[in-house]
């Protein structure tokens, strides 16, 4: 059992969310005696967050569930600069229109985890572009910039590692940590916010905000970071061989999302159940005791629970049933991901490599070729050995479909359109 007084820190500790806290006892006391407003920042660098950001969303979820007020800060302003933390090179700058489109797309996911509204602990979604776009540069340098030591900023690992490799760090990117620190102070002024959370790579940026707040007269501010997660085999969370595991349903189907979690390594099952589901800890402990083939039942529960939170219980159970029919009963379920191919194209024939790319099982013909040559590709459960193979309408089965498979667990139905 953890020694925390507050429900929030106790929950995070028991479930493995905590990496560092700036003032553990002070934050615990504050959370135990009053409703605390806390935030996590999200940069709109793509139309969707991916599964690597899910741990941050779950932290906001538990914050609200334990009686506090979560704020999801969208980086409409800082997104135009780009976070240089632990990046090897500068990010490409995005247009205002792209940022706005990405923010609108990302917002839809949060409603599945948080309750928004005007209540004391209802969630807020805020765009830092509201205040950053209107900053007077000279006033900002005088009032905020004077509190920052360049010597200290150069000592942060996020910057130091980049410079040690003799990689360029632009003045634009260097300003990112100042803007993020200012966000913390501005959010305190606007919403009485006291806590910023994030991944462990954000520790330096968050502590900068605490220091700036102290120098600018805010109440005591706090930092809490979560560990940067990798799988037991060292792979980054949110990535798979097929690409990013997006949270938006229009970028990754509920079935493919379910499959990602079903494929969790044995050594990660207990940890992921604690972090990504709301199952009681005693139930998680029971599932963690399963061994041998039974561990697969725990993986199915993990996949279904994580998918239910994001896509809804019906979509999660449909994905689980589709997988059961496909892998256990050998049936061809129409709930598998489906790609339409024009009838004329099928009649003329399409190369298997191009079909793999079209079905989004691979990103390039070269990748598809390697899978074919490695014996991982099947059409209607028959192995494909020739990368020059042409697939045409003759491959349609009695249901008018072609089943295209990569490995044992990735299947797409090709349907004439």
From Swiss-Prot:
Top-level EC class: ligase
Pfam families (UniProt xref): SYY_C-terminal, tRNA-synt_1b
One GO molecular-function entry: tyrosine-tRNA ligase activity
Gene of this entry: tyrS
Domain S4 RNA-binding intervals: 350-417
Summary of subunit composition and partner proteins: Homodimer.
Superkingdom classification of source: Bacteria
Stored NCBIfam families: tyrS
Protein name listed in UniProt: Tyrosine--tRNA ligase
Protein source organism: Brucella suis biovar 1 (strain 1330)
